[in-house]
C-alpha cells in the first residue's frame, strides 16, 4: 500500500514548528487527514496532487484552528466534500465521527480512535492493515505535546490515550507536525517517561514551597518568551491539576 502524500499547510510558527501537516490518502476515495488553515497554495497543492480528480473526504483530528479552520477553503474548491470530525456542541457543518467508527480513505479503511488529552475531541486514525497511525497532535518528533489546561487539555486523559495507542502496535505514524515517525512505540514510551519526570520536578517544587505556577515554570524551564512560555504554563497547570486529582 502506498504511503500518504505529505502536504504542508504553510503556517510555520513558534507553536506549529515548520507548520501543520495534512496527509492525502489517494485511491478510490481520495481523503485528506486534517484541513490546514485554508491558504491558497495549500489548496492548490492538494488539487495538483489529485490531478483533476475531486477530493472526496476530509477527516479532522481535532478542532484546533491549525487543523480544522481550512475546511471552508476546501469546501469552496470541492463543494461535495464529506467533512468529518468528532462533533462538539458548537460545531456546525460536519458529519460526526465517534470512537471506533470505520471510514473509507483512499483504498484503505481507517478506524477513528478517540484520544482525548491534548483536546477533548481529538481523534487519531488507524490503518490496521498497514499498522499506520495518523496521529494528529498526539505525537511529534523532536518535541513534546502541549497539554492546554483550561482549554480542554487533560494530562491524565493524554497518558491514557498514549497507552491506548501503544496497545495498537503502530509501525509508522503520520503526525500533525513534523516528519514521519518511523518508531512510534519508542516515542510513546519516551513521552510517558518524560511526563513522569516532569511530574517529579513539579512535586519537588511543591515540596520546596514553590507553588505559584509561573514560578514553577521559571524553575523548571528557565527563561522563556511568549508564546512558548504560555504553552509551558498550560502544561505545568495540567501537571498541577493531575496532582490535585490524584490526591483527593
Residue ranges and their predicted role:
Residues 1-51, 124-136:
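Conserved beta-strand hairpin/beta-sheet module of binuclear metal-dependent hydrolase folds
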Residues 30-32, 37-39, 109-201:
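Metallo-beta-lactamase
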Residues 40-84:
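Active-site metal-binding motif and surrounding structural segment of the metallo-beta-lactamase
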Residues 46, 177, 202, 243:
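Residue-level signal for inorganic ion chemistry
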Residues 61-67, 118, 177, 239:
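Histidine-centered divalent metal-coordination motifs
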Residues 62, 115, 244:
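Short, contiguous alpha-helical
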Residues 83-89, 93-95:
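Glycine/small-residue-rich loop that forms an oxyanion/phosphate-binding "nest" at active or ligand-binding sites
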Residues 204-248:
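C-terminal regulatory/interaction regions
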Amino acid at each position: 500500500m502506498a504511503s500518504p502524500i505529505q502536504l504542508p499547510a504553510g503556517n510555520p510558527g513558534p507553536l506549529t514548528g515548520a507548520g501543520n501537516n495534512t496527509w492525502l490518502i489517494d485511491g478510490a476515495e481520495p481523503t485528506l487527514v486534517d484541513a490546514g488553515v485554508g491558504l491558497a497554495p495549500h489548496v492548490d497543492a492538494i488539487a495538483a496532487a489529485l490531478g483533476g480528480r475531486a477530493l472526496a473526504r476530509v477527516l479532522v483530528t481535532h478542532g484546533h484552528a491549525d487543523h480544522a479552520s481550512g475546511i471552508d477553503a476546501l469546501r469552496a474548491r470541492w463543494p461535495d466534500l464529506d467533512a468529518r470530525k468528532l462533533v462538539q456542541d458548537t460545531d456546525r457543518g460536519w458529519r460526526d465521527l465517534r470512537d471506533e467508527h470505520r471510514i473509507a480513505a483512499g483504498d484503505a479503511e481507517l478506524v477513528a480512535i478517540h484520544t482525548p488529552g491534548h483536546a477533548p475531541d481529538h481523534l487519531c486514525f488507524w490503518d490496521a492493515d498497514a499498522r499506520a497511525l495518523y496521529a494528529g497532535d498526539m505525537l511529534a518528533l523532536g518535541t513534546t505535546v502541549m497539554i492546554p489546561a483550561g482549554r480542554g487539555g487533560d494530562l491524565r486523559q493524554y497518558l491514557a490515550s498514549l497507552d491506548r495507542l501503544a496497545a495498537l502496535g503502530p509501525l509508522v505514524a503520520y503526525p500533525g507536525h513534523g516528519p514521519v515517525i518511523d518508531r512510534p512505540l519508542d516515542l510513546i514510551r519516551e513521552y510517558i517517561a518524560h511526563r513522569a519526570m516532569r511530574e517529579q520536578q513539579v512535586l519537588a517544587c511543591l515540596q520546596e514551597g514553590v507553588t505559584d505556577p509561573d514560578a514553577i515554570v521559571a524553575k523548571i524551564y528557565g527563561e522563556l518568551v511568549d508564546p512558548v512560555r504560555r504553552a509551558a504554563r498550560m502544561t505545568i497547570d495540567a501537571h498541577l491539576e493531575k496532582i490535585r486529582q490524584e490526591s483527593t
